[in-house]
Amino acid sequence: MASGIAWTLHTAGMTRILLLEVAAPLAVRRRVSFCEAVHDGRQTVEGVTALAVADTAGVRSAWADGRLAVRVDPEWRSLPSLGADVVVDAILAKRNLGTRISDARLVIGLGPGFTAGEDVHRVIETQRGHHLGRVIEAGLAAANSGVPGSIGGETVRRILRAPANGVVANQVSIGHQVSAGQTVMTVADRPVTAGIDGVMRGLIRDGSRVPRGLKIGDIDPRGDVGYCDTISEKARAIGGAVLLTIMSSVCQ
């Protein structure tokens, strides 16, 4: 979701955007995730490029070149030196890991785990359905249902999860067509099989060390390979909601 938000804001003309990452990102939809810059130095998503940077000078240099900046900084130590106007917590941890309403003039939290008016100024609904992208000014987002959103009529079966703690070894790549029952990767030498026919829309990076139960793959039953390289409708909706929240704050 963070990449969809960053893409939306940058496309709308907000050019000073910094994405803070962990040292070993665990993104699944990697071809549309700016966190890949942590590994590769840069990542382009739908015409917008992010550069990996090591310090504040690097952040400002990326901005001057019209790029997004991606910095490994899981504890958000960069914020004070940059004087952020807006902070968006897009960790999607289902709980608040330490974000405070005092972190910036406008603090936005995505999904359950935040209370608008208490630990953040606004909460964005992330659950698929009628209220996706709703801006919540007071209170909570919907609780985590535990059921993935429906895509092409598929929910649980389209998601791949780690069967054990261990290291991932991929046997296919993003964009490959897979069949139900096919082994698409192993985790700690245990096979992970596709639950449905479809296109591998997302796949965690090969060699990643993962905990049991983590989402490590995403199969799209619609079969359109082009979806692998474009931002999802969910991320666009949430990105639009964040943009609306920022513009509403500016105009008040």
Language-model features, listed with the residues they occupy:
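Well-ordered secondary-structure scaffolds
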Residues: M1-Q252
